[in-house]
């Protein structure tokens, strides 16, 4: 069921918004990148064509975290959602037009809250720092964050995504050296 919904979503994004595009016209610029970002961040198996869309999406940063989330959401909303998929086509795969609209809006909102990509490569770069003081001497300790962000969990649980979350295989202890090792891995590694 998830794959058929993801397939219809892909078809929907490839299709045009009848209010903004004419038949056969391709999406370009940020509109194209926004649609690609939604599709690429909805699955863990990503082709190389995803790099520019994901890079563009995560390059959107504001001074305040809530402003970053809103700016990323606005970027994702550039992707047309009035995709002209008729009720009969949606009914064939067991969803109605309201479910399709709510599912797409929910997916875009979920993606907009991602602080970074949910891949082992990104998770291994998320380092926590702690200052420990004892007898007037302080030192800084480090570790790679051992917890998966809630946004990654929400994305994996969304009905329209096919996400295999990485697993943590590291030591949760704090170290004096800045971590250069990996602790997050794909489950099949």
Question: Model segments located where?
Answer:
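Sec-dependent N-terminal signal peptides
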Residues: 4-14
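Sec/Tat signal peptide C-region and signal peptidase I cleavage site
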Residues: 14-22
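Compositionally biased, intrinsically disordered low-complexity segments enriched in polar/Pro/Gly
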Residues: 21-24, 90
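Short N-proximal segments of mature Sec-exported proteins
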Residues: 26-56
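Active-site-surrounding "flap" and adjacent substrate/cofactor-binding loops of secreted or lumenal enzymes
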Residues: 52-74
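Alpha-helical ligand/cofactor-binding cores
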Residues: 69-86
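Low-complexity intrinsically disordered segments
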Residues: 81-189
